[in-house]
Amino acid sequence: KNKEELQEMINQDKWDDIYKKYPVADGNFVYLPAGCLHAMGKGNVVYEIQQSTDVTYRFYDYHRKDKDGNERELHLKQAIDCLSFDKDIDKNDVHPVVKVHENVKETIFISNDSFTVSQLLVIGKCQYKCDNYQLATVVKGSGKVDEYDVKVGDNFLIPTNTSIELDGQMMIMMTTK
């Protein structure tokens, strides 16, 4: 679709014609490049890597109303101007690279000039060396990072050229530049 077709469908409230639904299962990784209109469905957890910004543009808000009965403000022009219409997200162009270390499986989902996203599946005690800084989020299970207890939802930073001890049964999402 192009900007004009999108704007016309929005004007006609034809949201089902605008988006595509993709089935996902636990553990799937779906890469959506910047500029892709997206939303998540019920039960999904999103690990979104983005540049720091204080702006969010709202395309649609389910016609929800505030306490005064008014629909919340939408930012259609600004949002449409930020979209890339040349992206083919049907391909989900991800080619994971898997590395197995002692008691940890590392899956590198995507690595480009802007960022790298990987996943660690920890199944016991192991040493993990980081060449670059890492932003880490525990997404399943629990365990220890060095002497610190961690669980689902916990985040931590790993400095450049640091070795850490991981122990437990957990899945950790990692991001670096």
Summary of predicted features, one role per range:
Residues M9-Y57:
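Loop-centered beta-sheet repeat module
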